[in-house]
Amino acid sequence: MKFLILTALCAVTLAFVPINHQSAVETLTGQALVDYVNSAQSLFKTEHVEITEEEMKFKLMDGKYAAAHSDEIRATEQEVVLASVPATFDSRTQWSECKSIKLIRDQATCGSCWAFGAAEMISDRTCIETKGAQQPIISPDDLLSCCGSSCGNGCEGGYPIQALRWWDSKGVVTGGDYHGAGCKPYPIAPCTSGNCPESKTPSCSMSCQSGYSTAYAKDKHFGVSAYAVPKNAASIQAEIYANGPVEAAFSVYEDFYKYKSGVYKHTAGKYLGGHAIKIIGWGTESGSPYWLVANSWGVNWGESGFFKIYRGDDQCGIESAVVAGKAKV
């Protein structure tokens, strides 16, 4: 009898042992995740998207490519020192003549974000440094398919700093979106059905598409520097304010994938992988400081392809892996 009573008491006690709350919210997914995030905080809103974890990972890269900068990369740091920067800044209005800054591209089902972030930054900075005289739309595919192991592993991911070093040494040609203009437009079609297979890294072609009048070698655009930006918000702001958008990498969780609007701050959901993007400015919304960022998941994601992420606390590592470069003009 005593044994039975003791067993019953143990069972009752175990039933009231609290679970680890953080571990529980990290495993939330789908609509349950959206409901939790939208009720647990008011900084940003999420919406449910019918997609598998595997499909979400198609757009991301191996986390090692989004890690904080190594000592070797930190040794290249360049810092712009300014007395002050404005409370709000948007590269789209500061350099309104540069159409590329406003452009949202679509990497489709390939972890080519590192190449997109680099191509977008190169496009913007070439325009900025020439005061609008040159407005190339740089080809992510030229980096993705031709940089090879020098940059990383194609659709599995790559190092943003290596993409900029390739720009310096080998040059990069122009190329728009799928079936678009330029020498080498992106060869992977956007996923519109919601059920698309993972894409393979395209093969390197050192020739322009049929009908393009400029030869591949003549279409190259070059950089003169590739460097890291110090890991602090003030240095990143000064770099953008002085020279234009920068490329950054960070860790992605499922609640980011379901972002719809507001200032993102990781709240719940599992870790999915690394991602690279382009930071174009900053501001404050309802008292929350943010970075203004261009994603490469098409215009139907987030705030018409853009998003805001909390600024100043190295949210998801976004302030630990910022790179930039200067165009040869």
From Swiss-Prot:
Active site: 113, 275, 295
Function recorded in the entry: Thiol protease. Has a role as a digestive enzyme.
Disulphide-bridged cysteine pairs: 98-127, 110-155, 146-204, 147-151, 183-208, 191-196
Keywords of this entry: Disulfide bond, Hydrolase, Protease, Signal, Thiol protease, Zymogen
Pro-sequence residue ranges: 16-84
GO cellular component: extracellular space; lysosome
Keyword check for Hydrolase: yes
Name of encoding gene: cpr-1
Induction: Activated by a GATA-like transcription factor.
One Pfam family named in its UniProt record: Peptidase_C1
Tissue localization of expression: Larvae exhibit strong expression in gut cells and weak expression in hypodermal cells. Adults exhibit the reverse: strong expression in hypodermal cells and weaker expression in gut cells.
UniProt-recorded Gene Ontology molecular function terms: cysteine-type endopeptidase activity
CDD domains membership: Peptidase_C1A_CathepsinB (cd02620)
UniProt family annotation: Belongs to the peptidase C1 family.
Entries under InterPro entries matching the protein: Papain-like_cys_pep_sf, Pept_asp_AS, Pept_cys_AS, Pept_his_AS, Peptidase_C1A, Peptidase_C1A_C
Class of enzymatic activity (EC top level): hydrolase
Enzyme Commission code: 3.4.22.-
Protein name: Gut-specific cysteine proteinase
Secretion signal span: 1-15
A biological process term (GO) from this entry: proteolysis involved in protein catabolic process
Phosphoprotein as UniProt keyword: no
Gene3D superfamilies: Cysteine proteinases
